[in-house]
């Protein structure tokens, strides 16, 4: 069963050894995945001094709520970065024998969007990769029981990977920007499952 609990400065959702924590830093909500209490991945957030406002590396979230039902939990987030209004729905579901977190992002804008992505720093190296292509990445995880972590994008979104230092990998789910639309969409999913 997927559950939710209040933690210091936020909420944690998940089942068994797999959890996603949403934390408030006084400006925005960020989120991170953990397995058996060890950090697996954390969202990389936009920085006004560093990032081009037309190229969203991650949606900005300033409000958080949640709801439970139907065997799952949803985290509902909204926020704004410059002219971009972001919303994200994170749906947590138990999938015997694993957990799935499906993410549906919508960004409405009065400005130009050249790129839309959700970016994460994964605490795994390329040598931990089990499988990879333009739609997904799978890593082997060590633990009490061998398991895997999967990150996938739903078409037309795609996945990209880059080195994130000596002990990490930077990954993105990249949405297709529709220039004639004021609303852009991005769909991706995290999955944890035992081997």
Can you name each region flagged by the protein language model?
Residues 47-108:
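Extended, loop-rich substrate-binding clefts of extracytoplasmic carbohydrate-active enzymes
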Residues 24-29, 44-51, 92-96, 154-157:
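A short, sequence-level motif marking secondary-structure junctions
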Residues 2-5, 14-25, 86-94, 143-153:
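Broad, structure-driven detector of short, well-ordered beta-strand segments within folded domains
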Residues 1-48, 192:
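Beta-strand-rich N-terminal accessory domains
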Residues 5-7, 12-14, 25, 67-71, ...:
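Solvent-exposed loop and beta-edge segments used for protein-protein assembly and interaction
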